[in-house]
Amino acid sequence: MSAGAPVAPRAASPQLALTRAPRRGLLVALLAALLATGSLVAAPAPASAAGIKVAIVVGPAGSLTSSYLRSARGYAAQARSYGATVAEVYTPNATWARVRAAVQGANLLIYLGHGNGFPNPYNATLTPLKVDGFGLNGSLSSGNVRTTYFGEYYVRTQVKLAPNAVVILNHLCYSTGSSEPGNPTPTPTVARQRVDNFTAGFLRTGAQAVFATLGEASYLIDSLFTSDQALLDIFWNAPDRTWAYRISFPSARTPGMTAVMDPKAPGTYHRSVVGNLSMTAATWRS
């Protein structure tokens, strides 16, 4: 064939044309069968957070205040991204009156600030008016340094959360069993008592579980809104879990509830949860 001579288009092979048609028909038939039997199912849509209330409280924490406020605003944005309603009460205007009003009926309560727990180096007996609750502003615009404590008594007598509510205590001394910076490492017995005591008031508000962590809490929020996991599984799926030094015990302060602690190392208490740990995130959302 000479260069430049026109080339006639090649006719499709009859065998190829006959082969393609049956294959196309087979694929269509297979797809129809899968749809009919339910074998081909679309991925589930994200759970709706309509009607879920999240309350976030930040108390005065001195030099740590700005960091806690930044974390709190991030948690608020995260909760709103799922469709939840968010109430925020932040220092220097986080008085007890404002906090008490904001947290009523919350499905999720998150508190960041100073923690005052028991046992501690200052008191021989538990003082419910001052320990195991919130550290807040004593008056409006009282600043970000001075802390007024509203303890377990105020929580259990004046707060009513939604049924099956969850509480997250974030960055609080004592709440995970830890001591204040510079104080001696607690014994395992003292650490367990601190965890059990700090959760007791909150578990009398309608809450089914109280998580405490000295690290980020965003994974807890995400799991509550997007998974169907049991609360214990959510706890153990934490990105900073250790597991090797885990402690589990029945709550003495709240009979029927279980406490689990996950020390980073012996004596280093940074995560805990107390509550009805078989409850699922789906139940929390319902």
Q: Which ranges hold each PLM region?
A:
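Short, solvent-exposed coil/turn linker segments
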Residues: A3, T95, S141, R146, ...
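A domain-level signal for caspase-like cysteine endopeptidase catalytic cores
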Residues: A50-S139, T189, Q193
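Active-site-proximal C-terminal subdomain of hydrolase catalytic domains
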Residues: S175-S286
